């Protein structure tokens, strides 16, 4: 294949849909093109497909925006394990992806520390336990901890027929993957221990792979192997976040990743399908279509809801260092960042949600932080709504 033809195919908008490329360029040309990519551009991974052959990816064809990188590298100022506002959205979106009915108010009820009242809230409580587990960087990625994460977030809430056997980390029988156009079987149960050990070893390897790419590869491979009877997608998304936390991306738990997936979950499932369909044409499994999807539809759209502008942080940190902020005000500020993010709130709502401050203290806090330019106030009738971020003049209402 000459260079001009190769370059034309490489820049084709249907690059990751080899079946469409065949119609345009011919089966022979696409086969040759795919082989040239594998030989000269693809990077092998220490993971295998269902045939026992290595997975590949093309690192230069899945670009991550500088803004997306900065968002995930930013350090939340909240003292909470995760952003309550962001993780409310994360859990809500996860249930949307799985077609499970829930409400944000119920999710927030559980995240605020209340006990579950029914089966729906028990599932939410499981997600909360999972988020708390991965937020602790002392909980390293091991097979034992992965099993524990699965059990506390999902496994403990499944019917008996979908539960793992005692002393088993993975399923003991066949499972079918749904979500795409056609169900397909997961990796045979007898091969799961070896495949999952390789996956965990890969997560812990210092191999120079871009961490955001690697997190998405772990996400893909986990769901691809489907090690459980149920809860695989949910655990894959938690695994993704867990890896980012372990790699020093604290804002990962202040970012509702799954919201972006839920907004177009068909594209999420199609990205999986493209990997598998392309393998039938190319003869090898290239995970780049999933990386390309994740970079474009998630990473490059990131908004870390709980992190205010740097100038606001400097104002706060200076005031704190000068002793102008009380301990109660510090706790209230951290709670506002975590619980509301960019959302509006009222003094009455903050009093109810925080549950550990008198209304007079709440009122003094919001007026003071508004005057400092850390909170914006908006009047609507007799009510005043606040949100993180300063006004131009900092004057109280």
Label each residue range with its predicted role:
Residues 1-229, 233-397:
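FIC/Doc superfamily catalytic core
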């Amino acid at each position: 294949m000459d260079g001009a033809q190769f370059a034309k195919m490489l820049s084709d908008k249907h690059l990751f849909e080899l079946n469409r490329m065949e119609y345009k360029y011919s089966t022979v040309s696409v086969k040759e093109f795919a082989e040239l990519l594998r030989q000269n551009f693809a990077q092998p991974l220490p993971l295998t497909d269902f045939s026992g052959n290595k997975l590949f990816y093309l690192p230069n064809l899945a670009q991550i925006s500088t803004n997306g990188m900065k968002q995930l590298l930013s350090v939340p100022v909240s003292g909470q394990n995760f952003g309550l506002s962001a993780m409310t959205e994360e859990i809500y979106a996860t249930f949307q992806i799985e077609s499970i009915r829930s409400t944000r108010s119920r999710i927030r009820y559980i995240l605020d520390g209340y006990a579950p009242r029914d089966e729906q809230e028990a599932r939410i409580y499981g997600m909360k336990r999972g988020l708390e587990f991965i937020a602790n960087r002392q909980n390293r990625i091991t097979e034992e901890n992965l099993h524990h994460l699965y059990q506390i977030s999902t496994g403990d809430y499944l019917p008996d027929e979908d539960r793992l056997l005692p002393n088993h980390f993975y399923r003991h029988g066949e499972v079918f993957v749904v979500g795409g156009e056609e169900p397909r079987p997961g990796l045979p149960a007898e091969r799961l221990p070896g495949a999952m050990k390789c996956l965990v070893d890969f997560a812990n390897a210092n191999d120079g792979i871009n961490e955001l790419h690697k997190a998405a590869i772990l996400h893909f491979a986990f769901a691809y192997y489907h090690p459980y009877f149920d809860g695989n997608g949910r655990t894959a998304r938690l695994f993704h976040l867990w890896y980012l936390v372990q790699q020093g991306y604290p804002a990962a738990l202040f970012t509702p990743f799954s919201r972006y997936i839920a907004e177009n979950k068909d594209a999420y499932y199609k990205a999986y399908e493209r990997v598998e369909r392309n393998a039938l044409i190319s003869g090898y499994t290239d995970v780049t279509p999933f990386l390309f999807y994740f970079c474009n539809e998630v990473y490059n759209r990131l908004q870390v809801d709980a992190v205010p502008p740097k100038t606001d942080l400097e104002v706060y940190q200076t005031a704190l260092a000068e002793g102008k902020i009380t301990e109660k005000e510090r706790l209230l500020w951290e709670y506002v960042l975590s619980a509301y993010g960019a959302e509006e709130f009222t003094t009455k709502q903050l009093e109810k949600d925080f549950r550990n401050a008198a209304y007079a203290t709440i009122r003094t806090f919001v007026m003071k932080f508004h005057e400092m330019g850390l909170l914006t106030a908006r009047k609507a009738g007799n009510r005043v709504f606040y949100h993180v971020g300063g006004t131009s003049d900092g004057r109280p209402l």
